[in-house]
Each structure stands twice: as C-alpha cells, then as structure tokens.
Amino acid sequence: MLYNLRQELLAGIRAATSDAGYDYEVDQSAIELEDITDEEKGEFSSPISFSIAAAAGAPPVDVAAAIADAHRSNGLPAEVEAVTVEGGHINYHADTTDLADATLSTILRDGSEYGTRTDADPDTILADVSSPNIAKPLHVGHLRNTILSDAVMNILEARGHDVTRDNHLGDWGVQFGNLMHEYTEFGDEATLEDDAIEHLLDLYQQFEQRDSMLADLEDDETVTDQFADAVTEERDYHADSGKEWFTRLEQGDEDATALWERFRTVSIDRFKQTYDDLDVAFDVWNGESFYAQEGWNDVIIEKAIENDVAMRGEGESVYIPVYPDDYENVGDPQAADVDASLDRARQMREANDDLEDADFDPFYIVKSDGSTLYGTRDLATIEYRIEEYDADQSVYVVANEQNQYFQQLFVAARKMGYNDIKLKHIDYGLISLPEGSMSTRKGQIITAREVLDRAQDRAEEIIAEKGRIDDAEAQSVATKIALATIKYEMVAAKRERDTTFDIDESVALEGDTGPYVQYAATRGYSILDGADAAPEIDDLDPSVFNDTDVELLFELARYPLVLERCEERYDAAPLAHYLLQLAHVFNSFYHKNAVLDAENARTERLLLTKATTQIFDNGLGLLGIDVLEEM
C-alpha cells in the first residue's frame, strides 16, 4: 500500500510543483519514507523545497507551503488525511484505518505474490553468477558470490524481470594448459580417482609455487650466470609446455581436449554437490570454453578488426584502445559516450615508442602468441547474449577486485557496437574468516564445504543445548539454521566492503543473525497455531490498534518499497536489514501486547501476525532461507 501511495504522491507533487509556479524536474527522491514513530514528519515527507529555494529566491519553508497548498487544491490521495509543512519539509500523514485495510487485505489476498510486480515489457537479464574456476574447490568467496547472486536474481524476478542465471565457469585459458602439463609430468591416476579436486589443486599450486621460486632465483644477483641460465631454461620449459598444451586445446587436439574434459567433469560434479546443499540452481552453464569452441571468439576478433576498433600490437596481439574519457556512465546505454575511432591511439603510438607511455589502456583480445584472453570471451558472451537472447541487460556478480577490468570491458563493448544493452557489474567485497584471509595461490584456501560443515556443527550444538527438537528432526532443522546463518551473513554485509564472517557468533538465535529472523517467524507460526480459527479480514477494526500495533502495520506496508530499493541497487542487503527490523518490531509487538488473550484486539493482532508470517515467508524465501515452524 505504501508503494502505491508513494507513486500517487510522486505524481501529485510533480503537478503541485508546476502549479505552484516552479520549473523543476521532480524525480523519485522527492518523496521519502519516514520513521513511523516521528509524528511530526508523517509517513512520507518531501525535501524538494530545499532544491528549489535557491533558484526561486525564496525560503524553503515558503516554497514548501506553496507546493503543499497546490497539492491540497489538486486533491490528496484518499489514504492521506493531512499534509503539513515543518522546517521546509512537506509531510504527508496517512490515515491509519485506510493503511490497515489496504495493507492487510493486500498481503492476505496476494500471499506469496505480495511485493512482486508483473511487467508487461520485462527486461531480459543475463547474469554471470557463481562462476568458479574448474579444477579448484569452491571457497568461502564463492559462497558470497553464489548466495548474493541467487538472492539478487530472485528479487529481480520478483520485480517482473526475465532472468537467466549463467554459471559462467572459468574453464578456459593458459592456466589449464599449465595444469595439463603438470598432470602429465607429475600427476597420479590413483590420486585423481580418489580425490580429483584436491589433486588438481595441489598440481595447480605446485606449478605456481615453482614458477614463483624460479622467478626469484632469476632475479637473485648472488647466483652465477651459468646457474641463472639453467634456472631460466627450467622455468621456460614448464611455461612453454603449458602454453603448448593450451594451444593444442584451442586447436581441438584430441588428447588435450580429453584431458581438459575430464578436469571439467570432475569439477562440475563436485560443484553440484555444494550447490545442491545450498539449494541454488542455474539456468545455463556456459563457461568460457563455450565461446571458444562454438566460434564466438572468432566473431569478436574478426568484427573488431573489420570495424576498425582494434589495433595490432606486438607479435599476433590485437587490442582495443580505451581512452581516459571513455569510462563515464559506460554501463548505461543511454548515457555512454565512447570514442570508437583509432585516430587518437594511432597518433599516440607514433609519438611514443613504448605502448605503456601512450595515454590509453589496451584491452587485449588476442595475446602476442595468438591465444585469446578472458576479455575476448567476455565480449563474445555479450555478443552471444544479444544474438541468442535479445538481452536488455548483461550483469556480472564478481568481486570488486575486478572493478577496473569491467569498466574496460564495458568500454570495449560499446566500441564494438553493443550500444543498446545495459552492462552492470554487481561488485562485492572479499570475505574472510577470523583465522585469516584466503588465497588460492598461497595454498590457504578456506573451502565452502568447511564453512558449511562448521555452521552445521554449531547449529546442532545449539539445538542440543535447547533440547526442544526431536532427535529425528534435529539434523534437518540444524541444516536450515546453518544455511540461514551463512546466507543472511553473505547478503546483509554492506556489499562493496570486505567483511569477516565469524561462524560461532553468527549461528545464534539472538543478535543480528539469520536464525534470529527465522526464530521470529517461528514465533508467529506458534501464535497462529494457538488460535482456534484463522481470522477474516472483514472483521478488522483498526480503531483498536495501539502504537505498537501501528508500528508493526507500518513495517508490513514497507515491504514492496524495500524490494524496489533492492531492484534499483542490485543488492539484497536492504531486504536482509528490513527482515531484521521486522523481527525486532514483531518481537516488541508480541512482548508488549496480548494476542491470543487480547480482550479488544484479538482478531486484529492475529491478522497482523498472519500478515507478518507471510512477509517472513516471502522475504526469507527471496534470500533462499527456509522458515521453520518449529525451532
């Protein structure tokens, strides 16, 4: 109800601003939702007068009064009983009776659809989600990506968009040539059969550690020239062999392809076990290899050269120049403005012998040895999504370490002529456990499986301490509590910031945790189970509400606005924070109020409780968290 009311107020204040004589473009920020406990401000307020006052040459309070008068004259929405001006703010006060009738009837009528939206012309969104590298285990960082992206895509679908989740596997590149070299030189068939991912990870780390050690020796001024030459020869042998294996793979060599396919298959099998435990699924698994093997990479290279947006560099390399002034608003198809001409780049190349001295960044699509890069494959992905899906948006849930890369990718895409698609990098900060941060290359991986198992163990301990659940159900309940813990923490933390995830603190029924929200929902079900029969909305009498009842009602009415904010920000954190706040308000509601034993408001409070449990169901469901009817 508040969502629809805000839209009405927005339209009304646009008209009132014009009628009051002010030439000002009113946007969504003109109407703000306020704290229900602040009676002076009302449910909605507008600070628009402060933006208009300077140009109008009038005090904000006078501007606000003029707009408020015009809005009254034009007619206020039926749900608004008064409009006031306080300190330059225009405040709209909702009628509690109308708010209660509209909100509770809508929630109970719409059920699981409350807060969703049907769009007659939805955006087709293709999303890179999870996207692990094969031949390595999923680690705690993949948990954040997988859980965050699942929640965001759930919300975008709930808001009416057509979303395709693409687990864009990292399954192509010279690193897999290195791995094939290492396996053929040092791998063990029996060990691969016993624990494929662990063995492949060991080999990957062995290659990296040896290369790093040899590089250090090359730079060591204390060694003899003869020894340094031997070190260089040894290092080149392994590196060249890895490059050769990848070249063979790109050329479709039978042995290289068979070995790569084996690595890929065992990796996906292991990934699926964890995804099943997380209750997360994907629509497609178009890894980087898809675009190489299906010829999409070739399309990109040919198109870039034919359209004269790419330059040839050293050896066989090809790159698209990215100028400093290309970046602004590059993800927005309406606002992006890039220079696709090569004239500036050619002039810079003529003036500078060294490419690094030129005032542009080369976005490589072919390396000097003729092989492709992930930039090639990412451009191929955009081409494919436009051609095969007619995509309106291509979004990427990837850690913020890659912010600069994605800006360059988007510039390159615009220069390639992909001008009608929205390009969005949904970045997030790194996550660590108190023991320290993870690093694949240093061999300090904290696997997703370890995190899941530790959360499960802690949840089982809590259940045993409480002693409320039958042994037959304890493990299942513990699993849902463990998942609630992990999923809530992964989405509630400020998305762009690095965060530390303390499992022992987070697996708790108190505090700002997923299980705390779960427990509030369970309490709601317990109250409803104690009622003789479900109340009917026709019996609602909002006049019996006290302040605590109204505060809960207001929280329920906010839910669609929260989903709108999540959609605008491509972020599930506002929903996680809202559900926590709803849990706090609901806990206050049933502690301060009698519900089942209420003398005058039993029906009304049962309706509030029923609506609250529905929103817990809906909101937690979007986060991928199960509601428990018993904890």
UniProtKB/Swiss-Prot annotation:
Looking up InterPro entries in the UniProt record yields: aa-tRNA-synth_I_CS, Arg-tRNA-ligase, Arg-tRNA-synth_N, Arg-tRNA-synth_N_sf, ArgRS_core, DALR_anticod-bd, Rossmann-like_a/b/a_fold, tRNAsynth_Ia_anticodon-bd
**Motif ('HIGH' region) on chain:** 132-142
For this record, an example GO cellular component is:
cytoplasm
Identify the Pfam families for this entry. Arg_tRNA_synt_N (PF03485), DALR_1 (PF05746), tRNA-synt_1d (PF00750)
The alphabetized UniProt keywords are: Aminoacyl-tRNA synthetase, ATP-binding, Cytoplasm, Ligase, Nucleotide-binding, Plasmid, Protein biosynthesis
By its UniProt entry, which CDD domains does this protein fall under?
ArgRS_core
SMART domains documented for this protein: Arg_tRNA_synt_N, DALR_1
Q: Where, per UniProt, does this protein localize? A: Cytoplasm
Gene Ontology terms describing biological process: arginyl-tRNA aminoacylation
Q: Which reaction equations make up its catalytic activity?
A: tRNA(Arg) + L-arginine + ATP = L-arginyl-tRNA(Arg) + AMP + diphosphate
Q: Chief subcellular site?
A: cytoplasm
The catalytic activity of this protein is classed by the Enzyme Commission as: 6.1.1.19
State the family it belongs to.
Belongs to the class-I aminoacyl-tRNA synthetase family.
Please give the PANTHER family that the UniProt record associates with this protein: ARGININE--TRNA LIGASE, CYTOPLASMIC, ARGINYL-TRNA SYNTHETASE
Q: What is this protein called?
A: Arginine--tRNA ligase
Species whose genome carries this gene: Halobacterium salinarum (strain ATCC 700922 / JCM 11081 / NRC-1) (Halobacterium halobium)
Q: Which gene encodes it?
A: argS
